[in-house]
């Protein structure tokens, strides 16, 4: 049990972080969206950033509403908000993974014919890959939607005697729901790890073939990408730690520790959002022109 003062402190920190992320996401979408309307085309990285900005904007609002409803025990509202949060959470994970893959194929200096073929395919079918991420998020939340519908029905009949068979089946269904949600997050995490390893290998190769006295543009691109990926790795790891704590949640008072963990995780998400803004050449060029 933590003091109420600390709970309020971390709650305020979390709200400030969330509002900052919302402003950053809105800025990314507004600036790049205007550029899209003017030139009628965007680079793939900017397409990802616009999609990620929209997804993160919606995710952050869903997260705030979901957490406050959970803290206040508003179960009826919470059941509906959880679906929205899960959808944008999975979509954000996949978009972040696609961003790492794009960094890998654009920055890495490998010349193997298989790598070059994969790079060509990804760049050619990039809009369809983005649509595929949206489809995966939609399919993944179907079990959650069914589970939440059942949960709402049980809440409306909570004054009636419970059937143990129905309760057991519901618990098994929730286990399946958790497994499907975990798989939907593990796959992009594996893609992220593979892309990071390839980038590190490419960076090592660049260091071996260039003098250490100066840093060429290729090296700078590697370091910029790896900095963003390092922050994203912390975000992914932090999220999986929260899942672990959720599993063993009986050891903690969730209402007390909720804001501590949310403030911790969204601090890294805020860092990553800032890093994404600095990693887009188009966004930096437009913002510098406005100043």
UniProtKB/Swiss-Prot annotation:
Residues 1, 63-84, 147-182, 250-257 are extracellular. The gene is TAS2R16. It comes from Pongo pygmaeus (Bornean orangutan). The keyword 4Fe-4S does not apply. One of its GO terms (cellular component) is plasma membrane. The chain crosses the membrane at residues 2-22, 42-62, 85-105, 126-146, 183-203, 229-249, 258-278. Belongs to the G-protein coupled receptor T2R family. It holds the Pfam family TAS2R. GO terms for molecular function: bitter taste receptor activity; G protein-coupled receptor activity. Residues 23-41, 106-125, 204-228, 279-291 are cytoplasmic. Receptor that may play a role in the perception of bitterness and is gustducin-linked. May function as a bitter taste receptor for the phytonutrient beta glucopyranosides, some of which are toxic and some of which lower the risk of cancer and cardiovascular disease. The activity of this receptor may stimulate alpha gustducin, mediate PLC-beta-2 activation and lead to the gating of TRPM5. This is Taste receptor type 2 member 16. The keyword Cytoplasm does not apply. Interacts with RTP3 and RTP4. Its main location: membrane. SUPFAM superfamilies: Family A G protein-coupled receptor-like. InterPro entries: TAS2R. The lineage of its organism: Eukaryota, Metazoa, Chordata, Craniata, Vertebrata. It is found in: Cell membrane. Keywords: Cell membrane, G-protein coupled receptor, Glycoprotein, Membrane, Receptor, Sensory transduction, Taste, Transducer, Transmembrane, Transmembrane helix.
